[in-house]
Curated annotation (Swiss-Prot):
Protein's UniProt name: NADH-ubiquinone oxidoreductase chain 3
Catalyses which reaction(s): a ubiquinone + NADH + 5 H(+)(in) = a ubiquinol + NAD(+) + 4 H(+)(out)
Subunit structure: Core subunit of respiratory chain NADH dehydrogenase (Complex I) which is composed of 45 different subunits. Interacts with TMEM186. Interacts with TMEM242.
UniProt keyword annotation of Translocase present: yes
Annotated Pfam families: Oxidored_q4 (PF00507)
Cellular compartments per GO CC: mitochondrial inner membrane; NADH dehydrogenase complex
Coiled coil: none
BP GO terms, sorted: mitochondrial electron transport, NADH to ubiquinone
Organism expressing this protein natively: Reithrodon auritus
Major localization listed first in the record, in broad terms: mitochondrion
UniProt GO molecular function: NADH dehydrogenase (ubiquinone) activity
Length: 115
C-alpha cells in the first residue's frame, strides 16, 4: 500500500511539473537574444554547420555495441552458475546476437563512409 501511494504521488508530481513547464514558458525574445554571438564580431557565415548523417549513424552504432559489450563483460559473475556450459551458452548467444547485428549493419552499408 505504501509503494502504491508513493508511486501515485510521484506520478502526480511529475505530471504537475511537466504541465507547469509546458504552460508557463519564458518567451522573452528581443534582438540581443536572437542575434548570434561570436566574440563580439558580426558572424562571417552561418553558425549552423551541416552534419553528416553517416557519421551520426556510425557513432550511434558504436555506442550501442560498446554498451552491449560493457553489459557483457560482467556476465560470468552475474549468472553465478557452477555449470560452465550454461555460462558459455549464454555468453555465446549474446555474442552471436551482437555479431548478427553488426553483420546486418554491414550488409545494409551502414558502416561505409562513401556512397
Amino acid at each position: 500500500m505504501n509503494m502504491m501511494l508513493a508511486m501515485l504521488i510521484n506520478i502526480t508530481l511529475s505530471l504537475c511539473l511537466i504541465s507547469l513547464a509546458f504552460w508557463l514558458p519564458q518567451l522573452n525574445l528581443y534582438s540581443e537574444k536572437a542575434s548570434p554571438y561570436e566574440c563580439g564580431f558580426d558572424p562571417m557565415s552561418s553558425a549552423r554547420l551541416p552534419f553528416s548523417m553517416k557519421f551520426f549513424l556510425v557513432g550511434i552504432t558504436f555506442l550501442l555495441l560498446d554498451l552491449e559489450i560493457a553489459l557483457l563483460l560482467p556476465l560470468p559473475w552475474a549468472i553465478q552458475s557452477t555449470n560452465m556450459i550454461t555460462t558459455t551458452i549464454v555468453s555465446l548467444s549474446l555474442v552471436s546476437i551482437l555479431a548478427l547485428g553488426l553483420s546486418y549493419e554491414w550488409m545494409n552499408k551502414g558502416l561505409e563512409w562513401t556512397e
